[in-house]
Amino acid sequence: MVGVVFMDETYVAPEDAKMSIFDAGFIYSDVVYDALSSWGEYIFRLDEHIERFSMSCEGFRLENPYSHDEMRQIVAECVHRSGLDSTYIKLELSRGVIPNAEDGRDLRKAEQRFVACAVPYIWLWGEEKSKSGGNIHV
């Protein structure tokens, strides 16, 4: 698979990225995410996306482990390491896994997990139509 994933403080290939099926983000949809795009060296509205992501984390009472500057660097490095001209970028902060089974479902004890990835951008309408525009009938 093409792209790169940042998790557990390291960059890995998408096929090597693993998460527990007991992660609250998976079980309860207890996760904050944002999606961005890049074309060439330009990452579309990066600062606005990071700000929105941070506000969502606060709303979910999740502690984002990275500053805005660190997140900018992580995203830029994901795009760079992907080697792609156009990318779909996703940021996720999950409530995480409760490390001790004796704690049951006490999500306050979960270990949060941040993940970022950059994978090939998919032109839903095709690249030309996306640039020139199209008609939508509702």
Q: Which ranges hold each PLM region?
A:
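Conserved alpha/beta cores of soluble small-molecule-handling proteins
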Residues: 1-138
